Amino acid sequence: MSQFLPVTKKDMEDRGWDQVDFVYVTGDAYVDHSSFGTAIISRLLESRGYKVGIIPQPDWRRKESIAIFGEPRLGFLVSAGNMDSMVNHYTVAKKHRQKDSYSPGGKMGLRPDRAVIVYSNLIRQTFKKTPVILGGIEASLRRMAHYDYWENKVKHSILIDSGADLISYGMGEHSIIEIAEALDSGIPVSEITYVAGTVYKCRDLSRTYEPIILPSFDEVQADKLAYARSFAIQYQNTDPFTAGTMAESYGTKGYVIQNPPALPLTQEEMDDVYDLPYVGNYHPMYEKDGGIPALEEIKFSLTSNRGCFGSCSFCALTFHQGRILQTRSHESILKEAVHMTEEKNFKGYIHDVGGPTADFRQPSCQKQLTRGVCKNRHCLFPEPCKNLTADHKDYVSLLRKLRDLPKVKKVFVRSGVRFDYVLADPDKTFLNELAKYHVSGQLRVAPEHVSNQVLKYMGKPSHEVYEKFLREFDKANKKAGLQQFAVPYFMSSHPGCTMKEAVKLAEYVRDLGFTPEQVQDFYPTPSTLSTCMYYTGIHPLTGEKVYVPKSAHEKAIQRALMQYKNPVNRELVLEGLKIAGRMDLVGYGEKCLIRPVRKEHGDNKYTENAGRNRGSKHGPAPKKTIRNHHTRKKQK
């Protein structure tokens, strides 16, 4: 049986070690599961013979907390964890969140803001010359100069502010092994400038071969057009086959150099990574706190792929995992599934089989495997490329094998399907089997908006494509003799969304007959195309000027429009309708969003009625849900 990696000096000594090779410092609790980057990288290093100690969520107020193992032989590895620490701590409205799913018992406050910078500087206070290598999503998406939403300014590469030596960006397996081998052979960290998938600092460009010179930090900080230009260059250099080396000047501080991305893992390499001896659980020291909430959903889920060629503008995957699909073999996934069924808490349900996009199981075209993805076109947007290979046969086969396993009652697909890709496949077997076997009443899909103007900036297919998918999904349900519904996710205040577009979305929600309980407001996180548009007001790939709803008040209005029935939102909804010139939606008609303010008899009070208020003196109207709404529509 696997044992957890050392988290204390005693653990280290119990293994007979005098010193660890690497100390991995992470902002997450220690969960030894393949869905956690800390576990993958540390287990991979262990498999190559390196000794790794883990310091999960050290007390950043005490430098002693970083030194529990003493000085590592080769270096410190630093990550904020599975999530960016600022996204983890703050809502899009910049309010403190109440729960941290990656901490014991969901407790908030066990990691600092900007965890990577804080941890790195903490290390430097004690270990002045020990190599420090950054990894994980926080460091990866801040590897070059970037707009920071929380401070509303352009910030340095995280390599500058952290005092670290290297960034291993992206998924990191290839680069971390190459870095470890270089350090182990005695190469100074300052000389490790050749590893794909890394970022390093240098004084000048004399040893950098044919770099692409990005606008300097001073330029992108002062000029939004320069920022957009820099982002466009970086966006077009995210493919390991075609990307160049990029250099960003920091004046007297020298340069930050980004090497091309590491090559994607082969299927054999993917299988090896997921076959490492993970315990599959959180460390027992968290038992007293009730465990780690983030593990609950993924404990009985299976990762089948990495990468995504969907290229949604608001998603960071292009910068982090890349557009080239990488998959595990059926044998690897089935082996993990069988092991999962033997867990004492397994109830017969596999919660998910997927990745960034569940139904991607092969590269979008054969060209990707040898020449990379196209620099100046997308695979699915605005329409599927003529070279796209849309085929679900492999995924269908995998799901069938999983359904047939002993002890498995049902296999869910919850990580989301790309509905335009489903439609691009002429074979309807996947959609039919998805409806029949892998949905439980509701299928969550992400059309994001209904305005084609907004969808264009989002990099999403037109609304007509989504409506076609709904019709096909309905056919699949009828064929299976089931009554199931698609539950859409929508996003408010994305760049390009004027108040008129927001009202258009509210009208669509009205016609659906339900009110979303939660609304996803666009969150400008580092290194997404949408964030570049948000900050600059420019589409970086076209140079087009883009309207941006920026103020907290306007964002609140757009969010309120999607929840217009909530009485608390009435004034915001009314203001939004006035701005959009849509006062026709204030009244008593069936299509109206809110009723006008009505003066009560006998005094000066006003009644503020949100929604259409179909209730009467005999009682309130029944609550409208997706299920009863569809039932009523069918009865008409």
Q: What kind of region is each of these model predictions?
A:
Residues Y24, I55, D59-W60, H339-V487, ...:
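Conserved SAM/AdoMet-binding glycine-rich loop
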Residues I158-G170, A560-N604:
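Amphipathic alpha-helical packing elements
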Residues R61, S190-T238, A262-L265, I292, ...:
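Terminal amphipathic helices with adjacent charged low-complexity linkers/tails
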Residues V25-D28, D289-A316, T341, Y349:
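N-terminal pre-triad scaffold of radical SAM enzymes
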Residues R371, R377, L593-K636:
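Acidic, low-complexity intrinsically disordered tails
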Residues D165, V273, C308, I333, ...:
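Conserved, mostly hydrophobic/aromatic
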Residues D84-A93, L141-R143, E173-E178, R203-S206, ...:
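Flexible glycine/acidic-rich beta-alpha junction loops that bind and position SAM and/or redox cofactors
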Residues G37, P56-G251, Q258-N259:
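Glycine-rich beta-alpha loop elements in corrinoid/cobalamin-binding modules
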